From Swiss-Prot:
Known tissue expression: Localizes to the neuropil of the embryonic central nervous system (at protein level). Also detected in third instar larval brain (at protein level).
Source organism phylogeny: Eukaryota, Metazoa, Ecdysozoa, Arthropoda, Hexapoda
Protein name: Hillarin
One Pfam family per UniProt: Ig-like_KY
Domain (LIM zinc-binding) ranges: 9-76
Location in or out of the cell: Cytoplasm, Cell cortex; Cleavage furrow
Function: May act as a modulator of septin function during cytokinesis in the developing nervous system.
Cellular component terms per the entry's GO annotation: cell cortex; cleavage furrow; cytoplasm
Name of the gene: Hil
Origin: domain of life: Eukaryota
Keywords linked to the UniProt accession: Coiled coil, Cytoplasm, LIM domain, Metal-binding, Zinc
The UniProt record lists the keyword Cytoplasm: yes
GO MF entries: metal ion binding
Disrupted-gene phenotype: Mutants are viable with a 98.4% hatch rate which is close to the wild-type hatch rate. No apparent defects in the central nervous system.
Length: 818
């Protein structure tokens, strides 16, 4: 029997009970509203806790108003409610911050520091050879982005996007299926679900009683044994009072230990049985949802067919010449590779701006039936793609993993729809399938393996550790993958934090990963391997061993349009006998100007070991960029296995130079195996983090190299480096590094001069060997400019200017023979 709890209140607007999951408040005088009733009393505008206002001039008025209709104090009055004017006037001035690559600072790579510098080996970097970029697949387009790449997305206009796939627009479900008929079938399904949950509850209670009775019997037997032993020891001979007390204390301690031991054993057994029962419950729930989804689809298909006998299902009366509108299939087609790629369906998520807005709006309220929920989501959708999209976005916006449920949740409360999520019997994937059936879409849940959290390249799939589930939905004439759970991950780059004048929720609330919506099979297979081969949706399916050996790439790899410049990369890369191995990644042309890469190298079997003989492992990797190729050349300092993690971020020069923190995300990982090492490896000079060579200087600072275009320079005992400035820069500084020599002792060997737009660096090497040269500069930003030799330089009081930022670095081999 249901008992009201303390958290129930009455809605001020409709006087009905407000449940905790649907509650807004307490507000003025401890008033509450339903989220759906929380509207302006005057105009009905939907309000939030940030946008509502109370009447400040009448204490008895408990109602809520929008900013336009809240009673004002009179004409000409300026207060805190006046369209944010005061907030704008009080807004703090923006400041310049130190860029994370400024000398001596650290930047974050997925939460870890980007400390020291690059990598190693004396002879390992003596080659001038850098291979040219390989050609892209001519029929494939790169460079898709989701909402996180706002500086790209906003530059595209929806009207300018042309697609190879055109879908005839269909009439909404309201045209051919009455809401009441669909709701009637839902109520039948809900009764079946209620019966199933009662069965689950009864079974759990029965198992709980069995465990309780079993341990109670054991407790009584053991207690009787201890008591008998205690009484026997007391009766065997005369005992002093102290001895009797000792025996009594020992007996009490034995009882306490027995109780603790049995409580622990009971908890473990209950946990084990509950886990097994939950697996069985998930199976039964999935089977029920599968059958109910089929029944719902049959109803929709039947009514749709009846309607089509007398009316056209399409909204458009005329079609382009030669185009035959494709009707949505009544029965689920067999799995087959899609003929049209995701890029041909849509090129940017901005195309779904309207349906995404619907999903976000619907997610702000709680519906009591799936019929109401799905009708609100797809009521204005005219294609199967839009229907699948709005369901996908609703789930990602809802963020079910973080949702709070009351313990006394009932099936007829708003959040009772999602009780399967609460109890763990229903997953994102089962829910997505259920909602798709209400929208008339064929959908399946696929089981298999995934390279998910905790997976590292080279790991074999031998047990259930990396088991996962995902969906395939039939849209755009083919089966296409959807991974709601991974798409709903709310991870935000630091550079995407709220800006001045924007609310926190504006930038964080609806973050999602568009890669996992309608993912192309040839990209999806890098992370997911189905148990049923046909659900790879590939023309040439691969084996589990081949899946294990695929490079370990993340969604960002595809969102940035990256691809490997050489054929044959596997999850494990083997070095040659000098300990050398190279990973080369190609960038699309339109991304070369904004992509920045970093990396991390550590021992494969240890998260803590980031150094070798006191030297950072990062100094055994040389990262360089030539053209559209970024290369990571590893020289293992010893035999063994290493983990190379490559990160990337897309930034503009303006973003880079402001000094705002940039958090890099992983794009791919490799296991580097060095089976034998015949050469002693020497670490690279301890320079600033980042790539070697002048490419970054040109890309971000407009500094064009005149004399040396490659990251590796062969020089005599002196060297002149020249650059041309394409925009004003000032306060150049160069630092020289060599293993075994303190940096400050090398400072006198580097000078520079500027003449018009030419800057020249002159280096006189004190001895032969390998050197690293760091170059720093800043944009012209104020009337005073001084040379600074540390990164704690602040702007002068008479003018604001950027702090010194790392510009580029070179690796120089100095020898009299050069």
């Amino acid at each position: 029997m249901y008992r009201p709890n303390f958290y129930e209140s009455t809605c001020l607007r409709c006087s009905e009970t407000v449940y905790q999951v649907d509650r807004v408040g307490p507000l003025k005088d401890f008033t509450f509203f339903h989220s759906g009733c929380f509207k302006c009393v005057h105009c009905g505008t939907k309000l939030t806790l940030k946008t509502y206002f109370n009447n400040q001039h009448k204490q008895d008025d408990k109602e809520v108003y929008c900013s336009s209709h809240v009673p004002k104090s009179g004409p000409g009055h300026l207060d805190q409610t006046s369209v944010g004017i005061r907030q704008a006037l009080n807004a703090p001035r923006t400041n310049k911050f130190v860029n994370e690559q400024i000398r001596g600072t650290r930047s974050e790579v997925d939460g870890g520091p980007l400390g020291g510098s690059r990598q190693s080996t004396p002879n390992g970097y003596g080659s001038r050879e850098i291979s040219s970029p390989s050609q892209n697949d001519s029929d494939y387009k790169y460079g898709r982005f989701d909402a996180s790449a706002l500086h790209i997305a906003h530059a595209l206009k929806q009207t300018e996007i042309q697609k190879a796939y055109n879908k005839a627009r269909e009439k909404p479900i309201d045209f051919y299926l009455a809401r009441e008929e669909q709701a009637h079938l839902e109520m039948k399904h809900r009764k079946e679900e209620d019966d199933l949950y009662r069965k689950f509850a009864s079974k759990r209670a029965e198992e709980d009683r069995k465990i309780q009775d079993e341990f109670q019997d054991e407790w009584e037997r053991e207690l009787q044994r201890l008591t008998h032993k205690f009484e026997k020891e007391l009766a065997t001979s005369r005992r002093s009072r102290d001895e009797a007390n000792i025996l009594t204390m020992r007996h009490e301690q034995q009882k306490e230990d027995l109780e603790k031991n049995m409580t622990l054993r009971r908890s473990k057994k209950k946990e084990s049985i509950t886990r097994k029962m939950l697996e069985h419950e998930r199976y039964e729930t999935a089977a029920l949802v599968d059958r109910q989804s089929s029944e719902m689809l049959e109803l929709i298909s039947a009514r749709r067919s009846e309607y089509m006998q007398s009316e056209s299902i399409f909204l458009d009366d005329e079609f382009s010449e030669g185009a035959v509108p494709v009707e949505y299939p009544l029965n689920a087609p067999i799995p087959a590779p899609p003929a049209v790629s995701k890029f041909q369906i849509y090129t940017d998520p901005i195309e779904f701006e309207d349906v995404d807005r619907i999903a976000i709006s619907v997610a702000q309220e709680d519906q009591k039936t799936f019929t109401d929920l799905v009708r609100q989501l797809v009521g204005r959708c005219t294609t199967d793609i839009e229907k699948a999209r709005t369901i996908f976005r609703w789930i990602t916006v809802k963020n079910l993993n973080a949702m709070h449920f009351d313990d006394d949740l009932r099936g007829d409360t708003p959040m009772g729809l999602l009780r399967g999520i609460k109890y763990g019997t229903e997953s994102y994937h089962v829910l997505f399938k259920r909602l798709c059936s209400y929208a008339g879409l064929h959908c399946v849940v696929i089981k298999g393996y995934s390279k998910s959290a905790g997976y590292q390249p080279g790991v074999k799939f031998q047990d259930s550790r990396f088991r996962n589930s995902w969906n395939a939905v039939y849209v755009a004439g083919a089966w296409r993958f959807v991974q709601c759970n991974w798409g709903a991950r709310h991870l935000v780059n630091a550079k995407e934090a709220p800006k001045q004048g924007r609310g926190k929720n504006d930038s964080l609330r609806y973050e999602y990963d568009d890669h996992y919506f309608l993912t192309d099979p040839r990209e999806f297979i890098y992370e997911f391997y189905p148990l049923q081969e046909e659900w790879q949706l590939l023309k040439r399916p691969i084996t589990l061993r081949e899946f294990e050996n695929l490079p370990f790439v993340r969604s960002l790899f595809f969102r940035y349009g990256l691809h490997f410049a050489d054929e044959g990369y596997g999850a494990v890369v083997f070095t040659d006998d000098t300990g050398a191995a190279t990973v080369r990644i190609a960038m699309p042309t339109d991304m070369q100007s904004c992509l920045i890469f970093h990396y991390n190298l550590k021992f494969y079997d240890s998260d803590e070991e980031l150094s070798y003989d006191g030297v950072s492992l990062k100094r055994f990797v040389m990262q360089s960029v030539i053209g559209n190729i970024v290369a990571f050349r590893v020289h293992a300092p010893c035999s063994g296995a290493f983990l190379l993690d490559i990160f990337a971020n897309a930034v503009t020069p303006q973003e880079y130079l402001t000094g705002e923190p940039m958090k890099f995300k992983s794009v791919c990982k490799f296991k580097i195996c060095c089976e034998e090492l015949q050469t002693v490896m020497v670490p690279l000079p301890d320079c600033a983090s980042g790539e070697w060579g002048p490419t970054k200087a040109t890309r971000l600072f407009g500094l064009i190299p005149i004399t040396h275009q490659d990251p590796l320079i062969f020089a005599g005992r002196s060297l002149d480096l020249q650059f041309r400035m394409s925009r004003p820069l000032t306060d150049f500084m160069a630092t020289l590094h060599k293993n075994g020599i303190e940096e400050k002792k090398l400072a006198k060997y580097v000078t520079h001069s500027t003449l018009d737009d030419i800057v020249t660096f002159i280096i006189n090497f004190p001895e032969e060997g390998q050197y690293g040269l760091d170059i720093y500069t800043r944009e012209l930003g104020g009337p005073q400019h001084h040379h600074h030799h540390n990164n704690n330089n602040s702007s002068s009081s008479s003018g604001e200017k950027h702090l010194l930022t790392h510009c580029c670095k070179y690796l120089i081999n100095s020898s009299k023979r050069n």
